[in-house]
Amino acid sequence: MITQKKTLVLLLVLSLYLNGFSQKLTTNFGAPVGDNQNSQTMGVNGPVLLQDIHLIEKLAAFDRERIPERVVHARGTGAFGYFEASADMSEYTMAVPFQKIGKKTDVAVRFSTVAHGKGSAETARDPRGFAVKFYTEEGNYDIVGNHLPIFFIRDAIKFPDFIHTVKPSPVTNKQDPNRYFDFWSLSPEATHMVTRLFTDLGIPKGYQYMDGSSVHGFKWVNKEGKVVYLKYTWKTKQGVQNLTPAEASAIQAKNVGHATESLRKDIEAKKFPQWDLYVQFIKPEDLNSFDFWPLDDTKHWSEKKFPLIKIGTMTLNRNPVNFFEEVESIAMAPGNLIPGVEPSEDKMLQGRLFSYFDTQRHRLGGNFQQIKVNQPKNKVVNYNSDSWNSSRNSSFPNPDINYEPSNHIPVAEENKYRNASYSSAEKAIIVQSPINKTNNYGQAGEFYRSLTDTEKEHLIANLVGDLSQVNSKDVQKKMITHFYRADKDYGMRVAKALGFSAKDFR
């Protein structure tokens, strides 16, 4: 009995057969190609001629197939689907995906690792990128986060240095624990994230088996201009599943792209992965009410203090048809905001607002927004023009009017979309200093104490596995001191495993 799938395959083959005789090979300019197997030569065995335009075009196109890979998050995959709202959040925001129960919004998602290159293994102990693009009626909205809810540093000025430490050494071209622990030993704010990363959470089993977080706080603004701060959390409906180092090594020996393959196969089998989206709120007047600064991305918003509110569910139901066009070319950026969402004062976020757009211009060109996967659903109306591969000019109502304001074309901004006015928690003075409430160890200790005995054992073993490769005893002792300040038991267990005496840290 012929299954439905086999029927579709047979129809496709038949279609290709019937249409194949009418499909003529052409050059990029549409001229028919007479021979795609042999170059033009001087005689049968002679040298190849430069006049073989088809050969030159083909080789030149091949030479330019690769674009610069992402400086971080190079290894990744993607999928498409939709978000369905389960709550009416119009009391808090104008953002269109969250206005009405049952509203569906198309989404694109890119999952990734952080530190390594495009062809690296997906079994690395590394944060996983979790970026979602909402194609709304008022433009594209991106939530660009990670699978862990915090980060290593709180100020973007340290980001290039941090990434340099987890990238391969410029001398050996190999990732080296000496480098990243050297950096972390002098960055106490990293203690919390290092602790989370070296638990079992540091190696997700697959992208569909991990949660996600916006990491940063943002602002929601309603129609009255009222502001509330929030964070987003994605909760996987497949259940959180992770790999031990032994399991990861066994998988890596056979398949460096296991997570990409697993996600693709699940979608092909119609086992569509889903995530519930939650928000947590803090009122602007409450920002200074805690023993930490809520807009510090090294800090977690406790679910006990800031309850999770479910607002919808994301379902991924389509794989990319062409990986380059739909995944490699997708441009996620935390600056892709829509009315009702604004950036917070988070120092790390403020740097990302520039850096992500800038790296997309470097990778994809100045008109990366015009690539199909990056195009919004609504019409783009502005007078940004020209440059490489621009198609904007042809969309001008009057080709001669490429400026605004003009008496000839009444295209104007809508004042209702102005950013909200609000009073900053800071006085209007220019400073260059750390934040007031660093509290680098409190949440790291709370997280450690929340772990089970088995999870603590795994954490210590994973940390010691890397720290034992660090040549500097001074760096090892500084890291132990950070762990000790987070929790005495935590620090002492690492110290003992590395051969230090307890008296060294009293």
What is each of the regions a protein language model found here?
Residues 1, 18-21:
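Generic low-polarity alpha-helical segments
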Residues 23-506:
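Active-site-adjacent core segments of small-molecule enzymes
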Residues 1-8:
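Bacterial N-terminal signal peptides that target proteins for export
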Residues 9-19:
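Bacterial N-terminal signal peptides
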